[in-house]
Amino acid sequence: TIKISDNGIGMTGEELENNLGTIAKSGSFNFKKENADNEKVDDISVIGQFGVGFYSSFMVADKVEVISKAFGENVAHKWVSTGADGYTIEECEKENAGSEITLYVKEDTENEDYSKYLEQYTIDELVKKYSDYIRYPIVMEMSHQVPDPDKEGEYITEVSEETLNSMVPLWRKNKSEIKPEEYNEFYKQKFMDYNNPMHVIHTKTEGQATFDALLYIPENPPYDFYSKEYEKGLQLYSNGVLIMDKCADLLPDY
C-alpha cells in the first residue's frame, strides 16, 4: 500500500460524497469560485479544475480508501471504492483533522509493473518531476543503509523523514535577488547539461493572462534536434505543478 496524509481542514461525510463521489465535480474549482474575492484564498496554490485528478489513483490501485476528519468536527468518515462498483462512506475514528489516503496497489501483470510505485526511488522521482514547486513540504519516510556502529562491516536500515520537494521555483523569485550562478546551476540540474546556458530570459507578465517565464538558450542544440523524433515545447506549470512537459503551443516554430 501507499499511504498519503495531510494535516489540512479535512472533509465531512457530505463533502466526501460531493467531492469524491461525483466524477467531473471539482471541489478545488468550486472553492476558488466561492472565494474569488478573498485575497488570502487567492494566494493559495489550488490547481483543481475538472474533478477527475483524484480518480487517476485507480490507474495503479484496485482499491482506494480515504479517511477524513473535518476541522471542528467530532467524528471522522471513511470513503472506500474499488473504482467500478461505486463507493461506501461510513463513520470511523481519527484523532486529528486532515485526510489520509491509502492506495492498495494492483498486482503486477505481464504488461504492467505496478510494484515499482511502491519503491521510494520511484515516488521520490515522481514528486520531483510533477510537484517539486508546490509551496507546502512533501515529506516521506526514507530508508537508507548505514554502517552498524556495533558490528564492523555490517549495515542496518535507518528510517528518517525527508522533504522531497524544493517548494520555491526559481522563476517566482525576484530577478534582482538571483545570481547568475543560481540560474546556471538550476539549468544544469533541470536539463542534465554540463555546460552553462548561452543566454537566460526571465520575465513576468501581468494582465488578463498572468505568468512567469524562465527561458534558457543552450550552448548546443539537443542531440536529436535534426531528427524526426525531436519533440519541441516548453515545460508548463500551474501553481507549481507540472502540467505539460513539452507544450508546443507556447512559442511559434521560428
Give, region by region, the residue ranges found by the protein language model:
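GHKL/Bergerat-fold ATPase module in large chromosome/replication-associated machines
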Residues: 46, 67-86, 106-254
